[in-house]
A protein has these predicted regions:
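Surface-exposed receptor/substrate recognition regions of extracellular proteins
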Residues: 1-116
């Protein structure tokens, strides 16, 4: 069968409260949507196949954060505490999502990130 559209698995990350915040009032939820062959495949992404990591430049803090958020799934609630202890002195805080899509025959893997 011929399947039309982009054969690359891709994800988008949306922010429930937009992208610009005052640091003191930072709160949002990041949500992943997936696309394969121009079709929404979000429902087929298992929460256990989503891995969130954070990059603040502080490897120890970022690793601890990743362990604490290992079971998060497709939606990641964030508060100012998730930006790391040195956020006000940093150039940004990056949140990275790595996602695996299993279709029964193939596994597709992709990643995307956003920076606050």
């Amino acid at each position: 069968a011929m399947v039309e559209g982009n054969p690359d698995f891709s994800i988008d990350i949306e922010s429930s409260n937009g992208w610009y915040f005052d640091a003191e009032r930072f709160a949002t939820t990041l949500t992943i949507t997936g696309e394969l062959y121009n079709r929404d495949v979000t429902a087929h992404i298992l929460d256990s196949d989503v891995e969130w990591t954070r990059d603040t430049g502080n490897v120890t803090e970022d690793n601890a954060w990743a362990v604490a958020h290992a079971e998060t799934g497709k939606s990641l609630p964030l508060t100012v505490n998730d930006l790391g202890p040195d956020y006000m002195n940093m150039t940004g805080c990056k949140f990275v999502a790595r996602v695996l899509l299993r279709d029964g025959q193939n596994n597709y893997e992709t990643m995307n990130y956003i920076t606050f």
